[in-house]
């Protein structure tokens, strides 16, 4: 195994470890928020309640910061993985060219030399296939669009948008349509995040309150910044500019479709056109 192959395996192992650590945090953050909310609703909180509230608030800030730090770390390691993949492909290409050059110089070669060349070629092909298999472990699926939303908005809007996009021939990642019994929901969600061309972010009051939705949004935001092209397609539903700015100022500058201005059919058509144009 070459130095680059070893490096790639090490980077991918580190990436998977960071992803596992990130996966644990949204649920922990949600539990802390609910605990804080329960205490805040008490009309006459006890001194014990107040101490618990202070402790929970500190833990919440710590875990939110940890999640943000892991997101940055994950983006960096993914960038390094892409660079290593490119360098590995170049290395393999150089090796193949060397083999081709040797074959050209030995058109009259003897059996021993030819056997050696063929053996080397087989070894390179085998290594190439092993690396491709390892690299593609996270690329098993490919979706045109990921629907990031709160489950509370699914029935009225999201499922209808999903069905109409599928009718247009697009491959859509909607949780209820891709989750399989017995499989990890978190791993499936992460695969969708990593392997979707675009994400439709259905911004609503429910979305803003959801810890999982925030995790999805931050993951796609890091992808958009790192990959330097548009990935996030926002839809506003019963939210104001102030609501969106408070959630994340990055979204305010993005042109968004508002459900008060566009029908479901119009929203679907505009999403479809963006995806189709990106493939041309």
Swiss-Prot record:
Listed SUPFAM superfamilies: Toll/Interleukin receptor TIR domain
Coiled coil, from the record: 22-94
UniProt-listed GO biological process terms: NAD catabolic process; signal transduction
Annotated localization: Secreted
Domain TIR: 141-275
Record carries keyword Disulfide bond: no
EC number per UniProt: 3.2.2.6, 3.2.2.-
One GO cellular component term: extracellular region
Source superkingdom: Bacteria
Active-site feature positions: 216
Entry keyword Transmembrane helix: no
First-tier enzyme category under EC: hydrolase
Residues reported to bind NAD(+): 150-151, 180
Pfam families attached to this UniProt entry: TIR_2 (PF13676)
Record remark: domains: The TIR domain mediates NAD(+) hydrolase (NADase) activity. Self-association of TIR domains is required for NADase activity.
Protein name in UniProt: NAD(+) hydrolase TirS
Protein species of origin: Staphylococcus aureus (strain MSSA476)
Record gene name: tirS
